[in-house]
């Protein structure tokens, strides 16, 4: 019995060692993402790893697939639109600031603007605010402000990562051609594009977070849910495999319509699939209802 147990232990150690070696080999190229420049052969290495992926777990394969997609993605693909930005005025006093943080903006970092949202002056970190709340002496919001960076919506995500590293900041304000604030992107947004959604203790579930299967022919979905996720549930293709124009169900609708459609607008994606806009504003699409003539492949909610 002892010999058998020793063999099992040795076998387990060998398996663990192989797994560790494999993971190191898999993720070593990803270190390049956090350097100031991505090597020219970065994606060729990733492609070779993906080709030889028989021993990889599903999560590992998904990360590699997302890495390859990341090459062509821009800030515009993942940014939080202007209409969804929560920010605080520079003139806010400490009592108002404390209340705003608790009630409206449950995040570790909060944008600060002077006058209008087109004049973002930086952001504050929650830990700096806590220190100020403790002392309450000579409070000046300006003293707490940290720097952000400016980026165009067309900037590649990999270039944004490198710039964030150089500038040592986690927040970028996206500026339109007229110099106005178009959106916001954080390093967390970029990492979610790579490894999937990252929930932390400040994230709160809402009706827009993911999707809900209402019945065998209806799904209510956040516009930011990826098309591939919904395709798996529906059992039908919503886009061609080589179509890189969009990744989310909202992107599909915007591509089909050419603009942000009004609530109640319906489009037929195929003979079996109809998409109806159930929530939107003039600048962004928030929620859609997907209706099928045939039943869903499998009914589940997220």
From Swiss-Prot:
GO terms for cellular component: plasma membrane. InterPro entries: CBS_dom (IPR000644), CBS_dom_sf (IPR046342), FAD-bd_PCMH-like_sf (IPR036318), FAD-bd_PCMH_sub2 (IPR016169), Ion_transp-like_CBS (IPR044751), Transptr-assoc_dom (IPR005170). Keywords: CBS domain, Repeat. One of its GO terms (molecular function) is flavin adenine dinucleotide binding. Signal peptide: none annotated. Residues 79-141, 144-201 form the CBS domain. It comes from the Bacteria. Transmembrane segments: none annotated. It is not know if this bacteria is hemolytic. PANTHER family: HEMOLYSIN-RELATED, MAGNESIUM AND COBALT EFFLUX PROTEIN CORC. Belongs to the UPF0053 family. Hemolysin C subfamily. This is Possible hemolysin C. It comes from Rickettsia bellii (strain OSU 85-389).
């Amino acid at each position: 019995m002892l010999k058998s147990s020793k063999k099992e232990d040795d076998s387990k150690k060998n398996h663990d060692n192989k797994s560790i070696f494999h993971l190191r080999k898999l993720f070593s190229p990803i270190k390049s993402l956090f350097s100031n420049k991505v090597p020219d052969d970065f994606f060729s290495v990733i492609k070779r790893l993906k080709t030889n992926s028989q021993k990889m777990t599903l999560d590992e394969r998904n990360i590699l697939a997302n890495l390859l997609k990341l090459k062509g993605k821009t800030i515009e693909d993942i940014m939080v639109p202007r209409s969804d930005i929560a920010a605080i005025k520079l003139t806010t006093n400490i009592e108002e600031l404390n209340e705003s943080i608790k009630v409206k903006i449950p995040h570790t970092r909060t944008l600060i603007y002077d006058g209008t949202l087109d004049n973002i002056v930086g952001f504050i970190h929650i830990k700096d605010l806590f220190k100020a709340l403790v002392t309450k002496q000579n409070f000046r919001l300006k003293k707490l402000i940290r720097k952000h960076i400016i980026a165009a919506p067309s900037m590649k995500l990999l270039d944004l990562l490198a710039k964030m590293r150089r500038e040592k900041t986690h927040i970028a304000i996206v500026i339109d051609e007229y110099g106005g604030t178009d959106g916001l992107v954080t390093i967390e947004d970029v990492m979610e594009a790579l490894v999937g959604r990252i929930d932390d203790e400040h994230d709160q579930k809402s009706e827009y977070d993911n999707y809900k299967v209402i019945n065998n022919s209806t799904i209510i979905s956040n516009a930011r849910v990826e098309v591939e996720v919904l395709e798996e549930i529906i059992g039908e293709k919503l886009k061609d495999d080589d179509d890189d124009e969009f990744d989310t169900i909202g992107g599909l609708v915007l591509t089909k319509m050419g603009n942000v459609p009004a609530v109640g607008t319906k489009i037929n994606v195929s003979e079996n699939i109809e998409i109806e806009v159930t929530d939107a504003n003039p600048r962004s699409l928030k929620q859609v209802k997907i209706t099928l003539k045939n039943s869903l492949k499998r009914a589940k909610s997220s």
